[in-house]
Regions:
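A mobile "lid/hinge" subdomain adjacent to the ATP/sugar-phosphate binding pocket shared
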Residues: 264-305
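Nucleotide/phosphate-binding catalytic cleft detector across ATP-hydrolyzing
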Residues: 1-220, 240-242, 247, 251, ...
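Glycine-rich phosphate-binding loop plus the immediately following alpha-helix
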Residues: 193-197, 205, 227, 231-274, ...
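Short aromatic-centered micro-motifs
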Residues: 37, 234, 285
C-alpha cells in the first residue's frame, strides 16, 4: 500500500452525465475529509479544509491542486483543499478537531467556503486550458446526504446552502478566475448509504442497471465507512430497516491510531488535523532544534497496522449490529475508506458462502469515494424526470 492513496484527492474530471434542461442538478457530498461533487459536466473532489489568507495573496505559479476562493461581497480570500493543508505546519493549533470534524460544523466560516466551492465546482467544464462556468441560469437543485443517525440535522445543513451566493474561484491550472452568482432554492438531504444503493442500481444514462432488481428485492446491507462515521444500512426485500451509525469507526480513527503509533515510535506529534499533507510522502520529520539536526521517518507500516485494526473493529461491529448476517445475500461496500478496507473485508468474510461482497462502484468504475455522490445526483435526476413524466 502507498500512504498517498489515503490522502484526499484534488481533481475535477469533465465528462457528460445525464442532465435535464429545466434544472441544474448538483450532487454534493460534504464529507469530513473530502468534498465530492457530481453534475452533468463531470465529477470532482477536494479536501474539506480551507485557510484564510491576505487579500493580496498570490502564488508563484498555478498548481494542479490550486483552489483559491474569493468572496465577491467582502473580498475575503481563502485557500481551499490541498494547498491550504500544505501551507499549514504540524504545530499549527488554529483548527480544532471539533471545528473540522464536529457534527455541528454547519455555521463555521470554513464550512461556508467549502460548500460554496463545491457548488461552483459542480458548474464548471474544461475549455481548452481553462475552466468556465457553464450553468445557463437554470434553477439550481442540490441533492446531498447525511449519516443515518444525523438526519435530524438536515434543516441546519439546508440553511447553509440555500439563498444567494457570490464568489470567485481560481482553479487548478486555469489561467482565468471564474465568477459565480446564483441562488439555490431547493436542497434535498437523504441518508448517505442510500446514495450508494442508488448508484449501484442506476447506469450513467439514468436508467436502471440490469441487476438492480436483485438489490431491490433481496436482503442487502450497505456498509459505508466514511471519514468520521461507519454507517450500516440493512435492507430486507426492499424494506429499509433502521440503520446504524458508529461515530468512532472510519478513516479519522485510522489516522488517530496512526498518530499515536508515530508518537510512540518516533516521539513526533502529528495531530489528525495535520495528517493529510504527510500522507503524500508517508514520512514525518523529527527535529533537534538545539543541534540543527533533522531526520525523516517512514510511517507506511504504522498506517497499514492502524488501518487493519480499525477495519477489524468495524467488522466486529457489523457482526453485532446485524445478528442475522448469514441471511443477507449482498454486502455493498462503499466510500473511500471502504475502498481501503475492501481487501480486508473480502478476506475476513470469505468463509460466508451465502454473502456476496460487492464494491459500490461496480457499474461505473469511478473511485469508490464517488459512489454516494453519484447516487445523490442520479436519484435527484430520476425524481425530476419522474415528475416531468406525470
Amino acid at each position: 500500500m502507498e500512504t498517498k492513496d489515503f490522502r484526499t484527492a484534488t481533481e475535477f474530471v469533465s465528462r457528460e452525465n445525464a442532465g435535464i434542461n429545466t434544472a441544474w442538478i448538483e450532487g454534493i457530498d460534504l464529507g469530513y475529509s473530502g468534498v465530492k461533487v457530481f453534475s452533468e459536466t463531470g465529477y470532482g473532489c477536494f479536501p474539506s479544509y480551507a485557510k484564510k489568507v491576505e487579500k493580496d495573496f498570490t502564488t508563484l505559479a498555478p498548481k494542479p491542486e490550486m483552489i483559491v476562493y474569493t468572496d465577491l461581497e467582502t473580498g475575503g480570500k481563502w485557500l481551499v483543499g490541498a494547498m491550504a493543508e500544505d501551507i499549514t505546519s504540524s504545530g499549527d493549533t488554529s483548527d480544532t478537531e471539533n471545528t473540522l470534524y464536529g457534527r455541528y460544523r454547519y455555521y463555521s466560516p470554513m464550512f461556508k467556503i467549502i460548500s460554496e466551492t463545491a457548488m461552483g465546482l459542480a458548474m464548471i467544464k474544461r475549455d481548452g486550458n481553462n475552466f468556465k462556468n457553464i450553468n445557463d441560469n437554470r434553477k439550481v437543485v442540490i441533492q446531498t446526504g447525511l449519516p443515518e443517525d444525523y438526519m435530524e440535522d438536515a434543516d441546519a445543513l439546508k440553511e447553509t446552502m440555500l439563498g444567494r451566493h457570490a464568489f470567485k474561484l481560481e482553479l487548478f491550472d486555469s489561467k482565468e478566475p471564474i465568477e459565480f452568482r446564483f441562488g439555490v432554492d431547493d436542497v434535498y438531504v437523504m441518508p448517505q448509504p442510500k446514495g450508494s444503493l442508488f448508484s449501484i442500481c442506476v447506469k450513467n444514462d439514468g436508467t436502471l442497471h440490469e441487476l438492480s432488481g436483485n438489490f431491490m428485492s433481496d436482503w442487502v446491507i450497505v456498509f459505508d465507512p466514511g471519514f468520521g462515521t461507519l454507517d450500516i444500512y440493512p435492507i430486507k426485500s426492499g424494506h429499509v430497516e433502521k440503520g446504524y451509525t458508529n461515530s468512532n469507526l472510519g478513516m479519522r480513527r485510522v489516522l488517530s491510531e496512526t498518530s499515536a503509533l508515530i508518537k510512540r515510535q518516533y516521539n513526533i506529534d502529528v495531530p489528525v488535523t495535520r495528517m493529510q499533507k504527510y500522507l503524500e510522502t508517508g514520512k514525518v520529520v523529527s527535529h533537534d532544534r538545539r543541534n540543527f539536526r533533522s531526520e525523516s521517518h517512514d510511517f507506511t507500516d504504522l498506517l497499514a497496522k492502524a488501518n487493519a485494526k480499525v477495519c477489524e473493529e468495524a467488522l466486529d461491529t457489523l457482526r453485532d449490529a446485524v445478528p442475522d448476517l448469514a441471511e443477507y445475500k449482498y454486502l455493498i461496500v462503499t466510500g473511500g475508506t471502504g475502498e481501503a478496507w475492501l481487501p480486508i473485508i473480502e478476506e475476513r468474510l470469505s468463509g460466508m458462502e451465502t454473502l456476496t461482497v460487492i464494491a459500490a462502484n461496480q457499474n461505473d468504475k469511478l473511485p469508490m469515494m464517488y459512489s454516494n455522490v453519484r447516487g445523490y445526483y442520479l436519484s435527484r435526476y430520476a425524481a425530476i424526470m419522474s415528475g416531468q413524466k406525470q
